[in-house]
Protein backbone atom coordinates (compact mmCIF):
# COMPACT_ATOMS: atom_id res chain seq x y z
CA UNK A 1 0.00 0.00 0.00
CA UNK A 2 1.57 3.28 -1.10
CA UNK A 3 1.36 6.59 0.75
CA UNK A 4 -1.55 7.87 -1.36
CA UNK A 5 -3.65 4.80 -0.54
CA UNK A 6 -2.78 5.12 3.17
CA UNK A 7 -3.81 8.76 3.09
CA UNK A 8 -7.13 7.97 1.40
CA UNK A 9 -7.80 5.20 3.93
CA UNK A 10 -7.08 7.50 6.89
CA UNK A 11 -9.23 10.18 5.31
CA UNK A 12 -12.12 7.75 4.88
CA UNK A 13 -11.84 6.51 8.47
CA UNK A 14 -11.69 10.08 9.77
CA UNK A 15 -14.77 10.99 7.75
CA UNK A 16 -16.88 8.18 9.16
CA UNK A 17 -15.65 8.78 12.71
CA UNK A 18 -16.59 12.46 12.52
CA UNK A 19 -19.96 11.65 10.93
CA UNK A 20 -20.70 9.13 13.70
CA UNK A 21 -19.74 11.60 16.43
CA UNK A 22 -21.85 14.36 14.87
CA UNK A 23 -24.91 12.15 14.39
CA UNK A 24 -24.70 10.76 17.93
CA UNK A 25 -24.28 14.22 19.42
CA UNK A 26 -27.26 15.63 17.51
CA UNK A 27 -29.36 12.59 18.41
CA UNK A 28 -28.64 12.61 22.15
CA UNK A 29 -28.56 16.40 22.61
CA UNK A 30 -31.40 17.46 20.28
CA UNK A 31 -33.53 14.71 18.76
CA UNK A 32 -33.98 12.51 21.82
CA UNK A 33 -34.95 15.33 24.25
CA UNK A 34 -37.47 16.73 21.76
CA UNK A 35 -38.89 13.26 21.17
CA UNK A 36 -39.22 12.82 24.95
CA UNK A 37 -41.19 16.08 25.16
CA UNK A 38 -43.63 14.97 22.47
CA UNK A 39 -44.02 11.46 23.88
CA UNK A 40 -44.47 12.78 27.43
CA UNK A 41 -47.13 15.22 26.23
CA UNK A 42 -49.19 12.23 25.02
CA UNK A 43 -48.64 10.20 28.18
CA UNK A 44 -52.26 10.54 29.32
CA UNK A 45 -53.80 10.26 25.88
CA UNK A 46 -54.93 12.58 23.10
CA UNK A 47 -57.98 13.69 25.05
CA UNK A 48 -55.90 15.03 27.91
CA UNK A 49 -53.42 16.54 25.43
CA UNK A 50 -56.06 18.61 23.64
CA UNK A 51 -57.66 19.54 26.95
CA UNK A 52 -54.29 20.80 28.19
CA UNK A 53 -53.37 22.86 25.13
CA UNK A 54 -56.86 24.40 25.00
CA UNK A 55 -57.03 25.34 28.68
CA UNK A 56 -57.70 28.95 29.62
CA UNK A 57 -54.19 29.63 30.88
CA UNK A 58 -52.37 28.01 27.96
CA UNK A 59 -54.54 29.80 25.38
CA UNK A 60 -53.99 33.12 27.17
CA UNK A 61 -50.23 32.51 27.33
CA UNK A 62 -50.14 31.61 23.64
CA UNK A 63 -52.01 34.82 22.74
CA UNK A 64 -49.60 36.94 24.80
CA UNK A 65 -46.62 35.17 23.22
CA UNK A 66 -47.89 35.64 19.67
CA UNK A 67 -48.83 39.28 20.32
CA UNK A 68 -45.40 40.12 21.78
CA UNK A 69 -43.70 38.22 18.95
CA UNK A 70 -45.59 40.05 16.19
CA UNK A 71 -44.92 43.48 17.71
CA UNK A 72 -41.25 42.66 18.31
CA UNK A 73 -40.75 41.34 14.77
CA UNK A 74 -42.39 44.39 13.15
CA UNK A 75 -40.43 46.90 15.24
CA UNK A 76 -37.12 45.05 15.00
CA UNK A 77 -37.49 44.60 11.24
CA UNK A 78 -37.85 48.36 10.78
CA UNK A 79 -35.13 49.42 13.22
CA UNK A 80 -32.91 46.51 12.19
CA UNK A 81 -33.01 47.76 8.61
CA UNK A 82 -32.26 51.30 9.79
CA UNK A 83 -29.34 50.19 11.98
CA UNK A 84 -27.89 48.00 9.23
CA UNK A 85 -28.21 50.80 6.67
CA UNK A 86 -26.61 53.41 8.93
CA UNK A 87 -23.66 51.23 9.96
CA UNK A 88 -22.84 50.13 6.40
CA UNK A 89 -23.63 53.16 4.23
CA UNK A 90 -22.43 56.08 6.35
CA UNK A 91 -19.30 57.08 8.23
CA UNK A 92 -19.76 59.03 11.46
CA UNK A 93 -18.33 59.39 14.94
CA UNK A 94 -19.60 56.67 17.23
CA UNK A 95 -20.30 54.22 14.41
CA UNK A 96 -18.36 51.44 16.12
CA UNK A 97 -20.09 52.21 19.40
CA UNK A 98 -23.48 51.82 17.71
CA UNK A 99 -22.41 48.53 16.12
CA UNK A 100 -21.28 47.30 19.54
CA UNK A 101 -24.50 48.38 21.26
CA UNK A 102 -26.53 46.38 18.74
CA UNK A 103 -24.87 43.22 20.07
CA UNK A 104 -25.58 43.89 23.76
CA UNK A 105 -28.55 41.46 23.93
CA UNK A 106 -26.15 38.69 22.87
CA UNK A 107 -23.77 39.30 25.77
CA UNK A 108 -25.88 40.40 28.75
CA UNK A 109 -27.81 38.11 31.07
CA UNK A 110 -31.51 38.20 30.20
CA UNK A 111 -32.50 38.18 33.87
CA UNK A 112 -30.53 41.41 34.25
CA UNK A 113 -32.41 42.82 31.25
CA UNK A 114 -35.72 42.10 32.96
CA UNK A 115 -34.55 43.67 36.22
CA UNK A 116 -33.25 46.72 34.31
CA UNK A 117 -36.67 47.28 32.73
CA UNK A 118 -38.30 46.71 36.12
CA UNK A 119 -36.09 49.35 37.77
CA UNK A 120 -36.81 51.72 34.89
CA UNK A 121 -40.58 51.39 34.53
CA UNK A 122 -41.60 49.83 37.88
CA UNK A 123 -42.90 51.74 40.90
CA UNK A 124 -39.33 52.42 42.08
CA UNK A 125 -38.07 53.28 38.60
CA UNK A 126 -37.05 56.72 37.41
CA UNK A 127 -39.63 56.70 34.60
CA UNK A 128 -42.57 55.82 36.87
CA UNK A 129 -43.32 59.49 37.81
CA UNK A 130 -43.85 60.19 34.09
CA UNK A 131 -46.28 57.27 33.83
CA UNK A 132 -48.11 58.41 36.97
CA UNK A 133 -48.34 62.00 35.64
CA UNK A 134 -49.68 60.75 32.31
CA UNK A 135 -52.32 58.62 34.03
CA UNK A 136 -53.44 61.50 36.28
CA UNK A 137 -53.67 64.03 33.44
CA UNK A 138 -55.41 61.81 30.89
CA UNK A 139 -57.31 59.57 33.27
CA UNK A 140 -55.56 56.51 31.88
CA UNK A 141 -54.27 53.37 33.55
CA UNK A 142 -51.03 52.83 31.66
CA UNK A 143 -48.70 50.22 33.13
CA UNK A 144 -45.46 48.86 31.76
CA UNK A 145 -43.94 46.66 34.46
CA UNK A 146 -46.04 43.57 35.22
CA UNK A 147 -48.20 44.29 32.18
CA UNK A 148 -48.27 43.42 28.47
CA UNK A 149 -46.16 46.49 27.44
CA UNK A 150 -43.35 45.25 29.68
CA UNK A 151 -43.47 41.81 28.09
CA UNK A 152 -43.35 43.41 24.64
CA UNK A 153 -40.43 45.70 25.55
CA UNK A 154 -38.41 42.80 26.94
CA UNK A 155 -39.08 40.74 23.82
CA UNK A 156 -38.05 43.63 21.57
CA UNK A 157 -34.79 44.08 23.48
CA UNK A 158 -33.87 40.41 23.38
CA UNK A 159 -34.58 39.98 19.65
CA UNK A 160 -33.26 43.30 18.35
CA UNK A 161 -29.89 42.15 16.89
CA UNK A 162 -31.14 39.29 14.71
CA UNK A 163 -32.44 41.25 11.72
CA UNK A 164 -29.60 43.77 11.57
CA UNK A 165 -26.90 41.11 12.02
CA UNK A 166 -28.21 39.14 9.06
CA UNK A 167 -28.39 42.19 6.80
CA UNK A 168 -25.10 43.94 7.68
CA UNK A 169 -22.76 41.35 6.03
CA UNK A 170 -24.85 41.42 2.84
CA UNK A 171 -24.78 45.21 2.66
CA UNK A 172 -21.02 45.23 3.30
CA UNK A 173 -20.49 42.74 0.46
CA UNK A 174 -22.77 44.71 -1.84
CA UNK A 175 -20.79 47.93 -1.62
CA UNK A 176 -22.01 51.37 -2.68
CA UNK A 177 -21.16 51.53 -6.40
CA UNK A 178 -24.58 50.61 -7.80
CA UNK A 179 -26.42 52.91 -5.41
CA UNK A 180 -24.10 55.84 -6.09
CA UNK A 181 -24.47 55.31 -9.84
CA UNK A 182 -28.27 55.29 -9.50
CA UNK A 183 -28.14 58.47 -7.41
CA UNK A 184 -26.01 60.21 -10.05
CA UNK A 185 -28.63 59.26 -12.64
CA UNK A 186 -31.31 61.01 -10.59
CA UNK A 187 -32.92 58.13 -8.71
CA UNK A 188 -34.41 58.96 -5.33
CA UNK A 189 -33.60 57.25 -2.06
CA UNK A 190 -36.72 55.07 -1.93
CA UNK A 191 -36.33 54.02 -5.56
CA UNK A 192 -32.68 53.09 -4.98
CA UNK A 193 -33.64 51.04 -1.93
CA UNK A 194 -36.50 49.10 -3.52
CA UNK A 195 -34.89 48.62 -6.94
CA UNK A 196 -31.25 47.98 -6.01
CA UNK A 197 -30.75 47.33 -2.31
CA UNK A 198 -33.83 45.36 -1.30
CA UNK A 199 -33.56 42.62 -3.97
CA UNK A 200 -30.07 41.83 -2.69
CA UNK A 201 -30.93 41.76 1.01
CA UNK A 202 -34.43 40.26 0.93
CA UNK A 203 -33.32 36.70 1.72
CA UNK A 204 -31.12 37.89 4.58
CA UNK A 205 -34.02 40.01 5.82
CA UNK A 206 -36.44 37.08 5.72
CA UNK A 207 -33.89 34.85 7.46
CA UNK A 208 -33.39 37.50 10.15
CA UNK A 209 -37.16 37.77 10.65
CA UNK A 210 -37.41 33.99 11.06
CA UNK A 211 -34.62 33.98 13.66
CA UNK A 212 -36.22 36.94 15.43
CA UNK A 213 -39.57 35.14 15.51
CA UNK A 214 -38.07 31.92 16.80
CA UNK A 215 -36.17 33.72 19.57
CA UNK A 216 -39.19 35.78 20.61
CA UNK A 217 -41.42 32.72 20.94
CA UNK A 218 -39.05 31.06 23.39
CA UNK A 219 -38.02 34.04 25.52
CA UNK A 220 -38.15 33.34 29.26
CA UNK A 221 -35.54 35.14 31.37
CA UNK A 222 -36.24 38.81 30.68
CA UNK A 223 -40.01 38.32 30.47
CA UNK A 224 -40.05 36.41 33.76
CA UNK A 225 -38.98 39.52 35.67
CA UNK A 226 -41.73 41.64 34.10
CA UNK A 227 -44.67 39.27 34.23
CA UNK A 228 -46.50 38.16 37.39
CA UNK A 229 -50.14 37.41 36.55
CA UNK A 230 -50.97 33.98 35.24
CA UNK A 231 -53.69 34.15 32.61
CA UNK A 232 -52.93 37.81 31.82
CA UNK A 233 -49.23 38.51 31.29
CA UNK A 234 -47.73 35.01 31.25
CA UNK A 235 -46.13 33.94 27.98
CA UNK A 236 -46.12 30.31 26.90
CA UNK A 237 -42.63 29.55 28.34
CA UNK A 238 -43.73 31.04 31.68
CA UNK A 239 -46.94 29.01 31.64
CA UNK A 240 -44.95 25.85 30.93
CA UNK A 241 -42.71 26.63 33.90
CA UNK A 242 -45.72 27.26 36.16
CA UNK A 243 -47.35 23.99 35.14
CA UNK A 244 -44.16 22.01 35.65
CA UNK A 245 -43.43 23.57 39.04
CA UNK A 246 -46.92 22.64 40.26
CA UNK A 247 -45.50 19.17 40.76
CA UNK A 248 -48.58 17.04 40.14
CA UNK A 249 -48.51 14.35 37.48
CA UNK A 250 -51.32 15.93 35.46
CA UNK A 251 -49.77 19.42 35.55
CA UNK A 252 -46.37 18.06 34.49
CA UNK A 253 -47.98 16.24 31.57
CA UNK A 254 -49.84 19.47 30.73
CA UNK A 255 -46.49 21.29 30.79
CA UNK A 256 -45.11 18.85 28.23
CA UNK A 257 -48.26 19.30 26.13
CA UNK A 258 -47.80 23.07 26.14
CA UNK A 259 -44.10 22.57 25.37
CA UNK A 260 -45.02 20.54 22.30
CA UNK A 261 -46.63 23.67 20.83
CA UNK A 262 -43.25 25.42 20.87
CA UNK A 263 -41.58 22.29 19.48
CA UNK A 264 -44.03 22.20 16.56
CA UNK A 265 -43.51 25.91 15.89
CA UNK A 266 -39.72 25.43 16.05
CA UNK A 267 -39.88 22.59 13.52
CA UNK A 268 -42.04 24.70 11.18
CA UNK A 269 -39.60 27.61 11.50
CA UNK A 270 -36.66 25.28 10.82
CA UNK A 271 -38.29 23.83 7.71
CA UNK A 272 -39.18 27.32 6.48
CA UNK A 273 -35.61 28.49 7.06
CA UNK A 274 -34.16 25.56 5.10
CA UNK A 275 -36.58 26.19 2.23
CA UNK A 276 -35.56 29.84 2.08
CA UNK A 277 -31.86 28.95 2.24
CA UNK A 278 -32.32 26.46 -0.58
CA UNK A 279 -34.18 28.99 -2.73
CA UNK A 280 -31.59 31.68 -2.06
CA UNK A 281 -28.73 29.30 -2.89
CA UNK A 282 -30.46 28.09 -6.05
CA UNK A 283 -31.16 31.63 -7.20
CA UNK A 284 -27.55 32.61 -6.54
CA UNK A 285 -26.32 29.70 -8.64
CA UNK A 286 -28.69 30.65 -11.47
CA UNK A 287 -27.48 34.24 -11.39
CA UNK A 288 -23.84 33.10 -11.37
CA UNK A 289 -24.49 30.79 -14.33
CA UNK A 290 -26.16 33.54 -16.33
Residue spans for each PLM region:
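Transmembrane-helix boundary motif in ABC transporter permease subunits
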Residues: 3-10, 48, 71-102, 115, ...
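Membrane-interfacial helix termini and adjacent extracytoplasmic/periplasmic loops
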Residues: 8, 46-54, 59, 95, ...
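Interhelical loop and adjacent transmembrane-helix boundary motif
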Residues: 10-14, 56, 223-276, 290
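C-terminal transmembrane helix and the adjacent membrane-cytosol boundary/short C-terminal tail
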Residues: 17-21, 29-32, 36-37, 94, ...
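Transmembrane alpha-helices
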Residues: 20-22, 74, 104, 108, ...
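Hydrophobic alpha-helical transmembrane segments of multipass integral membrane proteins
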Residues: 28, 63, 67-79, 83, ...
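Membrane-embedded alpha-helices of multi-pass transport/permease systems
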Residues: 31-35, 39, 78-83, 112-115, ...
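Periplasmic/extracellular loop-to-transmembrane helix junction in inner-membrane transport proteins
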Residues: 37-74, 89-90, 243-250
Amino acid sequence: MNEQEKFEKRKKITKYVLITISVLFVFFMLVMPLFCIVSSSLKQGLGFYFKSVSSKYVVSALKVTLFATVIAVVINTFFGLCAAWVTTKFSFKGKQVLATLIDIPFSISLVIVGLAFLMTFGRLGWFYPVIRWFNSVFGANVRIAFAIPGVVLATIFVTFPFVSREIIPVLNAQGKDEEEAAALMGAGGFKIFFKITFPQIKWALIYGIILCTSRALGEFGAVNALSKTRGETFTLPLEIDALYMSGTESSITAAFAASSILVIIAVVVLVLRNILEYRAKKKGQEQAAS
